[in-house]
Amino acid sequence: MPELTMGSLFDGIGGFPLAAIRNGITPVWASEIEPFPIEVTMTHFPDMAHVGDITKLKGAELPPVDIICGGSPCQDCSVASGTRAGLQGARSGLFFEQIRITKELRDADILRGRSGQSVRPRYFCWENVMGVFSSGTPHGEDFRIVLESIARLHCPTVSIPRPYPWGWKPAGAIRMGDAFSLAWRGFFAEYWTLAQRRHRILLVADLGGSSAEKILFDYCGLSGDLASGEGTWQAVAESVRHCFTDTSWLDWLAGRQRENGAV
């Protein structure tokens, strides 16, 4: 199998490149604007190119990669934010730059003659705070927009409904046949060797296949994973595994609510 490659947006001090290297993936380039984090990643990943400010990048001019990762600024979505401007905010709204870059990369690959599962990037990863489940108007609208924006990289006309009236759950998935899949779940720092109650969302999309839920929910031994957290991970994986469908997001959501005693 050819070696996978990755591009990292909002790179910070290189968390995604570090994870990539530990899993046999090559980080090819990164986008970051702060000088100190760039110095850190230049030291740790000397072969990784730095491509600059995401708002000034053109995806068609970037080296193609198999995986695109990013943790867009979370301040406007965080419950600690004073205004909670969400995706309408100047910082958290940079999420749409990740969508733009991904689309431009894929469009350029299609022009090169690629199609189907060979179009790059095939995999899309996004990390953010759990506050995105509740930010936006109406309540939780921002996460619906996130899901819809990513799904439209595959199908430009698709619409993702709101999970009215219950709100978003910390784990879930969407699949469009065998040609697109998306999964998200909450990660809790106390199970990953960090003595903090720091909760984050990790979202993975397979833009050309059905592997997103397998990537995100199948348990495997990862660096820093404590045995005490294994049961929690496996419980989440088991609770969502049977919920994936090819046709009905609303059926999946209703099923989850019934399991939780909400309906």
Question: Where does each model-flagged region fall?
Answer:
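Class I S-adenosyl-L-methionine
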Residues: L57-V65, C77-V263
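Conserved SAM-binding strand-loop segment of SAM-dependent methyltransferases
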Residues: D47-D53
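Conserved acidic E/D residue at the C-terminus of a beta-strand in Rossmann-like folds
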Residues: S31-E34, E127-N128
